[in-house]
Every structure is written in structure tokens, then in C-alpha cells.
Regions:
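N-terminal secretory/membrane targeting signals
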Residues: 4-41
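Glycine- and aromatic-enriched membrane alpha-helices
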Residues: 37-487
């Protein structure tokens, strides 16, 4: 028996050695494959990051797109019933103009390769292979910037409610989105001269909101006030027809701002967008409190419309610096933006400037304040960039360097956009016409411009008074007997 054990033992040892050899060989293969597997894993992670970044930018753009619903409700609530349908038509046309013109020329001027003043490549989104990969792709970046442009245009239209020809809106929108707005955007977001000087505007307090307010101001100066707004040298209240609609619009805008500011990181991975969103909400809360105090001081009452506008003013104010300031500073910036809105409303009335929705103080003055505030409240840890000349704010030991850069960036925007939009409004006035007739304004733009009522129940049709040929004409308003509802 003993003689038979050796072969068995040998066979066992041989089997063990064979298994060991296979193990070593397998380990060698695995070791040789580790770099490839690691590379594959890294590639997969990169693809995942790109997908997440793209998704974040697109979802943010969808939120910004939905802000148009907020503008619709806000402006409808502050307009009279006879103009509610005209507001709806204006908003949907605003979107059409913004997408088409930003696709045709706006994106190229704002973000195409060019010089320090404007871009000159990428007409009709033909970028010749250039990929804006920071946000997950060119298409996502284009969509996000197009809805920003639409917001700026919406600001313009709100101030000119109740008295402006629809054709004038269209002509202005084509030139504004196609040429004016994107050039200023290029100065900072397109890597232009302001960006190289260290000017900061994270999500558009000046680029989006101040530009829109400037165009609104020049437009209303050329247009003039609504009928009966100023009588005997004093401003007369022309209240809107629905504060709940207005406030619903404010809340939708507030929600949309999470995409407006949050997705301006242009990436979800490696970017602290939650910090941006927290600052945005804290500022809005501060704005409501500030506007409430301002309303008590100016009007001796808690004006609900001022409270809503205070929230919007604060959101505008924090938009430039939401990524650059600490939370406490966001509250202060929002509070001051809300606080100064009611006095500016009173000042505009004294100057006989008719701003039905308060866009000039809310988007203009708050936009200026928020852009300047970076030069005061931005800590060094968030802003210092020696290559771009960016420094800390005044209250963080940075001196006045950043404040000065912010100031002349604002001044350049005011000069460029103010002059060009004033010229454009004057050209429109002298050509297609800017203002509807007094009869049309009294009848309401719903019927005089669009041939229908936003609220049909507002008017009681007199039986037999409407021939079929005139049922949808501007003359219909004179044949309608107003109901007891307010117009």
C-alpha cells in the first residue's frame, strides 16, 4: 500500500502546483488589465459627470422657461381686465422671438469666438465643431442662455402694459434679442473685456435684469404714461384687477429662480449649487421684510404688491453675487433691495414715469445694487483671481478695486443699452408706430389689438348689436355694455 502512496501524493502536489500556476497566471492577467479597467472606469465616470451636468443645465433652463408663466400672472394681475389677453399674447410671442433670434444671431454675438466686444461665429448655432462642454454640451448651453434672454425681454414688455402696439413689441424684440442683449452678455459671459477686467455678474443682475429695465425705462419715456395716470399734476392709482394672480406669479418666479441662479454653475458635479440656492432664498426672504418696512414708511400700510415686488427685487439683487457672498450678506443684500423699492416707486410717480408693474425699481435699481454689492460683501476666498484682477470686497479688506470694476461695468451697460434702446424705440415710433390710439386704449388691447376678450364675461353682448362682419373687430368694444365688474 505504501508503494501506492507516492504517486498519489505526487499527483496531489502536482495538482496544487498546477492550481497555483493558474492562480499566478490569472493574477498576472488581472494585473495587466487593471490599467485598462481603471481607464474604462474613469471614462465611465467622465461620461456620467457630463450626463449629470447636461441634465442639471437643461432642468435649470426648464425652470427659467417656466418663469414666463410667472411674468404672465404677475403682469396680468397688475393690469386691468380689458388688457389681460394682450399680456398672454405678448408672453407667448416673447418666447418665439427669443428662441428664434438667439438661435439666428444672439448666441453667436454673445458666446461665439470673436473679439473682446462681440462674438462673430456660430450663426444659426453653426459653431464649426466648438463644444461648450462645461455645461454638458452646446445645445444645453444654448437652451439655457436663450431662456435667460427671454427673461430680459419680458422685463421690457411689462413696463409698457396697456398702451403699446403689439407690432412695436415684435420689432423691438427682434433687434433687442438679436443684437443688443447678447453684445453686453459677451462682455462678461463670453469672455469679453469686462470679464478680463475682473467684472463679476454670476447670473445676470446687470446682464439680464438691468438691461431689461433700461430698455423698459427708455421705452416708457418715449411711449408716455397711460391715459388718466397723471391728472392735476399728481399720479393717480390705476390698480390691477387681481392681487392673487400677481402673487402667484411672484411665487412662480421665486421657484424659477432656483434654476436661474442654481443652474448658472453650468455643472452639477464639483459645483456647490446648493450654496447658491440657499443664498438666493435667504435674499428673497430678506427682500419681503425690507419691502414691508419700506411700504410702512412710504404708504403707512403693508402693501401686498410691494411685498411681492420686494421678493423679486431681492432675487434680482442676489443674482449677481449668489455664488460670491456668505449667507448673512445675502440676507442684507436682499433686505436692502426690497427696502429701496417702494421709495423708487414714489420717485418715479413724482417724475411722471409710468411703470405699471414696478420693473424699473425691481429689475433696474435692484440690479445695480446687487452688482455693486459684490464689491462690498464678497470674501477673498470666493473671489480672488490674480489672473483676472478679481479681488475681495471692501468689507473683507479688498479695498475699493472690485467695487470700482463693478461700478464701471454697470456704467458701460447703462450707456450702451440705454442709448441703443432709446434710438430703437424712437425709430419704431416714427415708423410702425409705438402707441395705440386713445380709443383703443380705452377699449382695451384685448379687443382692439387681438379681437377677443381675456375675460369674455366682463362684457354683456347686446342682442343683435354685433354684425358677423364686425364681431371680432376693434369696433366691437363700443357696442359692448360693460358689466358691473371692474375693468
Amino acid at each position: 500500500m505504501g508503494g501506492n502512496h507516492l504517486p498519489v501524493l505526487y499527483q496531489g502536489v502536482s495538482s496544487m502546483r498546477l492550481r497555483s500556476l493558474w492562480t499566478v497566471a490569472a493574477a498576472g492577467v488581472l494585473l495587466l488589465g487593471v490599467p485598462g479597467l481603471a481607464a474604462a472606469q474613469d471614462g465611465s465616470l467622465v461620461e456620467t459627470d457630463i450626463a449629470l451636468n447636461t441634465l442639471w443645465v437643461v432642468l435649470g433652463g426648464v425652470l427659467v422657461l417656466f418663469m414666463q408663466a410667472g411674468f404672465l400672472l404677475l403682469e396680468t394681475g397688475l393690469s386691468r381686465m380689458k388688457n389681460a389677453g394682450a399680456v398672454a399674447g405678448k408672453v407667448i410671442m416673447n418666447l418665439a422671438i427669443a428662441f428664434l433670434m438667439f438661435w439666428a444671431t444672439g448666441f453667436a454675438l454673445g458666446f461665439g469666438e470673436g473679439n473682446n466686444f462681440l462674438g462673430s461665429a456660430g450663426w444659426f448655432l453653426d459653431l464649426g465643431g466648438i463644444d461648450y462642454g462645461a455645461g454638458g454640451g452646446t445645445e444645453a448651453f444654448f437652451f439655457f442662455q436663450a431662456v435667460f434672454a427671454a427673461v430680459s425681454l419680458a422685463i421690457v414688455y411689462g413696463t409698457m402694459l396697456d398702451r403699446t402696439k403689439f407690432a412695436a413689441y415684435i420689432v423691438f424684440g427682434i433687434v433687442y434679442i438679436g443684437v443688443i442683449y447678447p453684445i453686453v452678455a459677451h462682455w462678461t459671459w463670453g469672455g469679453g473685456w469686462l470679464a478680463q477686467d475682473g467684472f463679476l455678474d454670476f447670473a445676470g443682475s446687470s446682464i439680464v435684469h438691468l438691461q431689461g429695465a433700461l430698455a423698459a425705462l427708455t421705452g416708457t419715456l418715449v411711449l408716455g404714461p397711460r391715459l388718466l395716470k397723471f391728472r392735476n399734476g399728481k399720479a393717480q392709482p390705476i390698480p390691477g384687477h387681481s392681487i392673487p394672480l400677481f402673487m402667484l406669479g411672484v411665487i412662480i418666479l421665486w421657484v424659477g429662480w432656483m434654476g436661474f441662479n442654481g443652474a448658472s454653475t453650468l455643472a452639477a458635479v464639483g459645483q456647490n449649487f446648493a450654496d447658491v440656492i440657499v443664498n438666493t432664498n435667504l435674499a428673497a426672504a430678506g427682500g419681503v421684510i425690507g419691502a414691508s418696512i419700506g411700504s410702512l414708511i412710504m404708504f403707512r400700510t403693508l402693501d401686498v404688491s410691494q411685498m411681492g415686488n420686494g421678493a423679486i427685487a431681492a432675487l434680482v439683487g442676489i443674482t449677481a453675487g449668489c455664488a460670491f457672498v456668505d449667507p448673512w450678506a445675502a440676507v442684507v443684500i436682499g433686505f436692502i433691495a426690497g427696502l429701496i423699492a417702494p421709495p423708487i416707486v414714489v420717485l418715479l410717480d413724482k417724475m411722471k414715469i409710468d411703470d405699471p408693474i414696478g420693473a424699473i425699481p425691481v429689475h433696474g435699481i435692484a440690479g445695480i445694487w446687487g452688482t455693486l454689492a459684490i464689491g462690498l460683501f464678497a470674501p477673498a476666498a470666493r473671489t480672488v483671481d490674480a489672473d483676472l484682477g478679481v479681488s475681495a470686497g471692501l468689507f473683507y479688506g479688498g479695498g475699493g478695486e472690485q467695487l470700482w470694476v463693478q461700478f464701471y461695468g454697470i456704467a458701460a451697460t447703462i450707456a450702451f443699452t440705454g442709448v441703443l434702446t432709446l434710438i430703437l424705440w424712437l425709430v419704431i415710433k416714427w415708423t410702425v408706430g409705438l402707441r395705440v390710439s386713445e380709443d383703443q386704449e380705452m377699449a382695451g388691447l384685448d379687443i382692439s389689438e387681438h379681437g377677443m376678450y381675456g375675460y369674455p364675461e366682463q362684457f354683456i353682448e347686446v342682442p343683435g348689436a354685433f354684425p358677423e362682419s364686425t364681431r371680432h373687430s376693434a369696433g366691437m368694444a363700443s357696442l359692448a355694455r360693460p358689466s358691473t365688474m371692474s375693468d
